A protein has these predicted regions:
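The feature marks proteins involved in alpha-glucan
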Residues: 1-45, 53-57
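Substrate-binding/active-site clefts of carbohydrate-active enzymes
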Residues: 12, 47-67, 73-189
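Intrinsically disordered, low-complexity segments enriched in small/polar residues
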Residues: 24, 42, 72, 177-178
Length: 189
């Protein structure tokens, strides 16, 4: 988790972020957030990586927040007025690697989040500290400017920390009994 290159395992000798403090100086500019009745929404559900990773997408920044931003005219042309982004939060794609027909299969979907508060680093188009946060903000701002609402698919019912034997990434360390249902003795989740 926290890897800037998709599908490359971080080794002990590699340096990676364990925590970050982000100064929020992003300029949202002037725009109005769209607000439609749910019955009027035309929703396009998409996966950040999957929507633009193929060459046929025609975007420069394939499989990233920036790649989706490049496709906004296409979404407008379709008549879409809301996008639902499948999990965009930090997760470990190397969590359960498997082989199939000689190819490495990764945790593609992101349904085992590590942190609900951090966009997935590998969805940024450039390997630059905190780029993913600004690229996500740019995407949301431009979707809104084009009249497209943003819905986030957030997974609250399980995380990459697993059960009581799993690793501690953040939720257990922040406040275990707030983030997890515990047994009456407070030991298991």
């Amino acid at each position: 988790t926290g890897q800037s290159k998709w599908g490359e395992k971080i080794t002990r000798k590699d340096h990676f972020y364990k925590a970050r403090v982000v100064e929020d100086t992003y300029d949202w500019g002037e725009y109005v957030q769209p607000s439609r009745e749910p019955k009027d929404l035309i929703i396009y559900e998409m996966h950040v990586r999957g929507f633009t990773r193929h060459e046929s997408s025609g975007v420069e920044h394939k499989g990233t927040f920036e790649g989706i931003r490049e496709k906004i005219p296409y979404l407008v042309e379709l008549g879409v007025n809301a996008v639902e982004l499948m999990p965009i939060f930090e997760f470990d794609e190397m969590e359960d690697v498997r082989e199939y027909e000689g190819r490495k299969l990764l945790n593609y979907w992101g349904y085992n989040p590590v942190c609900f508060f951090a966009p997935n680093t590998s969805y940024a188009s450039a390997l630059e500290f905190n780029r993913e946060g600004n690229e996500l903000r740019n995407l949301v701002r431009e979707l809104h400017r084009n009249g497209i609402e943003v819905i986030l698919d957030v997974v609250f019912n399980h995380t990459a920390e697993g059960n009581e034997m799993g690793p501690t990434f953040c939720f257990k360390g922040i406040d275990n009994n707030i983030y997890y249902m515990l047994t009456p003795d407070g030991q298991c989740y």
